[in-house]
Amino acid sequence: MLVLVINSMKASHLILGTQRETPSDAEVISHQLMIRAGLIRQVSSRIYNWLPIGKKVLQKVENIIRNEMNNAGAQEILMPMVQPASLWEESGRIDQYGQELLVFLDRHDNKFCLGPTHEEIITDLCKNLLTSYKQLPVTLYQIQTKFRDEIRPRFGVMRSREFLMKDAYSFDLDQESLDSSYQIMKNAYIKIFDSIGLDYRIVKADSGAIGGSDSEEFHVLAESGEDLLAFSDKSSYAINAELLTELQDEQDPFSLEGKSSPDVKGILKLKRGIEVGHIFKLGKKYSEVLNLRIQGEDTDIYPEMGCYGIGASRIVAAAIEQNHDEKGIIWPDALTPFQVALVEVNPKNKDEIKNKSLEVYNLLKENSIDVLWDDRDKRPGVKFTDMEVIGIPITVIIGDRTLEKNEIEIKRRVDEQPELVAHQDLIASIGLR
């Protein structure tokens, strides 16, 4: 069960960090709006601090992921970001990753690396944890910071050097059991992205440096996406367009548009996507090379492994790419940092307005509505601009004009005109209970 945490507060107590100017180096809208809305601040080249509003959204992503992982029977652990380089040498991936793997020496000249992924560590861990086939199948996961020394970090947190990721690893007795674990994780991913409210596609993909056999990617559709996707307009068929070489004219993936889908169900459409999840059937690649042996019924076996990753911080950026307008972010309901903004405007009688605002603030909290009370001594235009760029879906406005009539003004983020409601009808009109 996903627990809703209500964290209402006053804007005067919150480090908002909003900005009016768009950073000159921000190429895509998600990067621009994450800076302007005060979600992140850059520390170094594509390494970011997450400010209170951003951390609140990121935590909502984590909670949705954690909830579905737990529902799928996966068990949460936490592995170190710093890994012995010897494990990467043993698996052979230290050369494969090259300079993207940040390697360093400790004071005793022992070689370590900052983990971009954790296949080696989890396999080494399970040498001691898993001893018998009776413990299988099992899936372990973590939500952990990763580091990849990208040659061209760009697009804000969409392709940053440090990022937050959920990675899970399944261990199975045989291929049939792996197929089952893989499907369970795939179904969990579908629930995660459906819960968040993203328009996405599941596409056949290349396993890349992770290795293994079958793999699929989850892509959020957005013009800023770096991958070109080809998918049927009549079925669930979808693939990274670069992999569909046999249908391309002169090795041009854009030539796929309008051709018959390989599953003979519909016509191929092309759109760009942002990869936010990737699932793999690793087979015995890591269990064999790192010598993870488990006692079987008759003899020792190398377990079949699966690997399942979700970019938690990238989801935040992808959601913004898909949900914004000229004023700022329009969050999916599941990710909005606050459900309601409470704004005081033009008070002639400050005490009366303050008391009314406090009354409404407490009423919203009593009804389990997450509210940000903008009690700052700022002009109304500044307050409304901040609430719009942050993307709070509903603004409740308390002012002298409405106070005289015992009414409250409600402005929805996606509507042009506000509505006036009686005080006693506020909660029903908001419709969030």
Which residue stretches match the model-derived regions?
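NTP/phosphate- and nucleic-acid-binding module
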Residues: L2-R433
